[in-house]
């Protein structure tokens, strides 16, 4: 489950500090609103992804560490002027889940009877939840 927590940015005017905070050398800035920016690692969406985040109004899922900072880059970044609770309302934490599908009791196949309760397949669904605030 993805959690939200406060973090300290050592140098508010340094991209290197933001990169260190989110753990990625290749970062992308996304406008959160007129007064805030999101920073996310570019290479976080990759094969083997076990969780991702949906940001309200943004067309692609986000993965990895995400930093929310006050400012638009024209001045040094600062702490957000909104609460974590307010920010969290714009996110959904998602993870793919595999649900087993079992054969029904009266199922008959071309080659004979299928044992009731035998695993027939797996269905994929996306579990969506609000972030946990720490």
Swiss-Prot record:
It comes from the Bacteria. Keywords: Plasmid. Could be involved directly or indirectly in exopolysaccharide synthesis. This is Protein PsiB. It comes from Rhizobium leguminosarum bv. phaseoli. The lineage of its organism: Bacteria, Pseudomonadati, Pseudomonadota, Alphaproteobacteria, Hyphomicrobiales.
């Amino acid at each position: 489950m993805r959690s939200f927590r406060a973090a300290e940015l050592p140098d508010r005017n340094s991209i290197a500090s933001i990169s260190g905070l989110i753990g990625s050398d290749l970062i992308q800035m996304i406008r959160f609103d007129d007064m805030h920016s999101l920073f996310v690692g570019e290479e976080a969406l990759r094969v083997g992804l076990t969780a991702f985040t949906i940001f309200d109004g943004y067309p692609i899922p986000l993965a990895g560490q995400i930093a929310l900072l006050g400012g638009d880059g024209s001045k040094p970044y600062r702490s957000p002027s909104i609460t974590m609770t307010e920010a969290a309302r714009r996110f959904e934490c998602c993870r793919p889940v595999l649900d087993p599908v079992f054969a029904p009791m009266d199922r008959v196949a071309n080659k004979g009877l299928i044992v009731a309760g035998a695993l027939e397949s797996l269905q994929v669904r996306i579990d969506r939840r609000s972030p946990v605030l720490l």
